Amino acid sequence: MGNDKTNMFVAIALSLVVLLGWHYFVTGPASERQRQAAQSQTAQTGAPQTADGIPSPSPREGGPNAPAPGTLPGAAAQGPVSREDALARSARVRIDTPALYGSIGLKGARIDDVSLKNYHETVSDESPRIVLLSPTGTANPYYAEFGWVGANAGPLPNADTLWKADGDLLAPGRPLTLTWDNGQGLVFKRIVAVDDKFMFTVRDEVENTSANPVTLYPYSLVSRWGKPQTQGYYVLHEGLIGVLGGDGLQEYTYDKVGKEPAYGGAATQGKAWTNVTGGWVGITDKYWAAAAIPEQDKPFTGAFTERTDGATKIYQTSVRGDAVTLAPNASSVTTQRLFAGAKEVNQINAYEREFGIKQFDLMIDWGWFWFLTKPMFRALDFFFHLLGNFGVSILLVTLILKLFFLPIANRSYVSMAKMKAVQPEMTSIRERYKDDRVKQQQAMMELYKKEKINPVAGCWPVLIQIPVFFALYKVLFITIEMRHAPFFGWIQDLAAPDPTSIVNLFGLLPFTPPEYIPIHLGVWPIIMGITMFIQMKMNPAPPDPVQAQVFAFMPIVFTFMLGSFPAGLVIYWAWNNTLSVIQQYVIMRRNGVKVELWDNLRGMFKRGNKSAAAKG
């Protein structure tokens, strides 16, 4: 039983190594951006549709490799054009809010040009702003569309419809009204409003001035052409996402949706959820998302699809409302919304409350352990607003967690201290019963009972730290609030690895290490490794040589493992190790137990000197 505690430590440590190793070596960093540069040049007379009748994009819209306007039939197709050229193909109404800028094309009335004012590609404010939505004709179109589908209703608004606008600006407090008459008795009016953050409200009115009843189905969709670059981590979902009524959260990666059965036509796969009430659908990246939000009290059909057009994969999430029948001289109004922006936690929650959007908070991937990650974020966010620095918030939350678990940790360390005090008796028992394991275990148990020692109590501090570690890791990895959040000194982004490198002596040598060098080891991972080394040297080495070797290499393994982890996580671990060392030192001194740190360090250097002398 004497080695049970050590075996437990080894098992826990090895489990962590396996988990971190899987993350580091298998899931890996970001996968290659999959740019699609070719698309079928087949001429089409009408837009293809999914099984629910919602339009699916086609090459004739001016996408990659579609013939340019004015090109003769059979002429060579041109490739994607710049965003500027694509935007210039249609008259546009400008979007300008405190958080967004962009435009809506009057041709098609899609929301297909949105950039984020307050977010940049890198830490530098001089770097380009984040571009979220882009029109067809660019390399990777990404847009939202609203409209109506139906049979025997005459022409309906589509990607080629030219709308009339009542103004040249869409801004908070300045809605935009678009109108179009199909010439056969249907008049369409669309009022688009935007708030000061990331929510568009689209109010569609249709009036039937004909002599016949008309049945229409309102829809909204988010469409993305080409598979984007993804992070490729198992702790993060990127791709198609939605909440579909009672079916709850649905998450489909770009690869997964393409494995679904055929849906509505050739080269289209997907899945639909029918007759659901409450929810939303969209496409999400790590920090950004676009989501179509139907009326929450009316049933709808939601769908995720992938359509192959030439070499291009087109991903689409859509909602289609129930039928609306318009009698002659009757009208109908449908209100839908579009979220297009940064996944700010407080803003997402505010939208959920304001508009009653079912489980809109699941737009952020809190994971299975949301009951840990959400409180962790709340605590960090609270102290950030109090102190103004997320790094300091991490240190303070770690200290509070230490104080919260102090009774458990104290009992564990007291038990460990008692165990050290009886080490001579334990050694004597092992020698006395070295040939009889049963009697040895019985004698050990009697000793533990006599001295009131829990042999596995020392495992609790480690076990407690594991869920906290992963909760903090999740928060650092998924929340945009941590993106580009500085600490002090060289740490300007707590969500990114320590930017320094041992390869150039942490910046002392005048060159930047090339990215292909597999060793990424900065200052903070080394500090963490040192604190872990000191913590392990507080205890005597395990008697088993194999276990001793495992413990000796553990700080080195974790130092390299955490080299590519977010700096905030490494800072947390180093700080937590430091607090643990202080706590253990105080408890051991109070219990009259000798602290082994200095003896272990001296012994290590003596062994090193003896080995060097022997080789000499």
UniProtKB/Swiss-Prot annotation:
Keyword check for Cell inner membrane, yes or no: yes
What membrane topology was assigned to this protein in its record? Multi-pass membrane protein
GO CC, sorted alphabetically, is:
plasma membrane
Which purpose does this protein serve, as stated in its record? Required for the insertion and/or proper folding and/or complex formation of integral membrane proteins into the membrane. Involved in integration of membrane proteins that insert both dependently and independently of the Sec translocase complex, as well as at least some lipoproteins. Aids folding of multispanning membrane proteins.
Task: Output the NCBIfam families linked to this UniProt entry.
Answer: PRK01318.1-4, yidC_nterm, yidC_oxa1_cterm
Looking at the Swiss-Prot or TrEMBL record, what is one Pfam family this protein matches?
Answer: YidC_periplas
Q: Which family does it belong to?
A: Belongs to the OXA1/ALB3/YidC family. Type 1 subfamily.
This protein's gene is called yidC
Q: Which residues cross the membrane?
A: 8-28, 386-406, 460-480, 516-536, 551-571
Which species is the source of this protein?
Methylorubrum extorquens (strain PA1) (Methylobacterium extorquens)
A Gene Ontology molecular-function term?
membrane insertase activity
Which compartments does it reside in? Cell inner membrane
- State what protein this is by name: Membrane protein insertase YidC
